[in-house]
Amino acid sequence: VTPQVLDILDEYGWKATFFCVGDNVRKYPEVYQEVLRRGHRVGNHSFNHIRGYRYSVEDYVANVQKASTYIESCLFRPPHGRITFSQIKALKADYDIVMWDVITFDYDKKKKPKQIMRTVRNYLRKGSIVVFHDSIKAKENVLTVLPQALAYWKEKGYSYGLL
């Protein structure tokens, strides 16, 4: 899915920050390199996309550090937005922890493209961080909605900024 997302972003002249799962980068290093080659930024999204609250601080940090052997970035986004204060404290010396304010739920098979686009239109504000997913679960929705969202943002005069 990532190569198709990259093509859509290129078509509209936009850059994005991709928060990568370390195990995916390990399995598909050529896709990771292509993201960088096309001028996008990357962030760490853990090695196994784990839910923070289910892990000790030590195990969580170890998982993030394992991902950092494949992903060179000072940015970290906790999977599912789940992270404890103790985990934040342990990671903040090495990472800027980046959350979001607009989640598209593009991975939810029950969500239709129209609903996702409505979310994008209704909740976008100046400075918003919008989350799309370049995953198999999100494929149908992201490939439909991302071009619509980019066209809408251009029409409304929004611009992007890499994190």
Predicted regions and their residues:
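Histidine-centered catalytic micro-motifs
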Residues: 42-48, 81, 131-134
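Acidic-and-aromatic substrate-binding clefts and catalytic sites of carbohydrate-active enzymes
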Residues: 19-28, 50-58, 77-84, 105-111, ...
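Anion (oxyanion) recognition and catalysis
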Residues: 10, 36, 91-92, 154
